[in-house]
Amino acid sequence: MESEELFYPEISVAIGSYALQKGVEVEVYSDQNSYFDWAKIRFTPQFQENISVKKKEPGTVMLGYNRVLDTVFEGYVTGPYSGGGYMDEIVLKDKMLLLEETIISNTFLDVTPQEIISYCLAQAGVTETKLSAEIYQPRSVVSIAQKNVIAVIKEINTIWGIKNKFFFSGGIFYWGEKPEQEKIYNFEYGVNII
């Protein structure tokens, strides 16, 4: 078995047109009980005045070793950031931000949960999805008035008595499904971790 020392990871951050490997500190948060995953990127003073990004510009955080980096977060800038201010960080949220900002008002007839969710995701511009294949009894009428997509999915779960979790992973939206784990890391105390 091959062993690598994994003491000090390399960091690469891309936000809008910027790519940074130094002068940044990264905090990434993911929790199955939270709809959003988020990342905070903090800058040293030398970068604070020179960086300017708009709301919803894409951002990526990558970590790794020996110039082999894995993407640990992909998302969008939550608010504009302009150099010269007192802020020293940019907050990114995952694609759930698109669902939060997309408002749905529609009446659905003879519909299943998957059909409503597919419609809502299309309205938000989300194309890659994995929805539960479980068969649910269609409802004759479901009316949605001025709700964001997150609230619509919560309402769907209530109407049908479903407890399906929903989230993004690797840019794909999951509802009642789970992504397959591609890599398994083996950490050994004193060998590759302290």
Where in the sequence are the language-model features?
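Short beta-strand-centered interaction patches in the first periplasmic/extracellular domains
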Residues: M1-E2, M87-M96, K130-I194
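Assembly/oligomerization scaffold segments
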Residues: M1-L98
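Short capping/connector residues at structural and topological boundaries
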Residues: D31-N33, I104, N192
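Extracytoplasmic/secreted envelope proteins and their assembly/folding machinery
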Residues: E74, Q114-S118, I150-K154
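Short, well-ordered alpha-helical packing segments
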Residues: T78, L121, I153-N157
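Glycine-rich, acidic and aromatic/proline-enriched surface loops and short helix-turn segments
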Residues: P80-Y86, T112-T129
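Short, charged, solvent-exposed linker or helix-capping segments at domain edges/interfaces
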Residues: E101-S105, Y185-E188
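Second-shell loop/turn segments in exported
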Residues: T102-D110, S140-S143
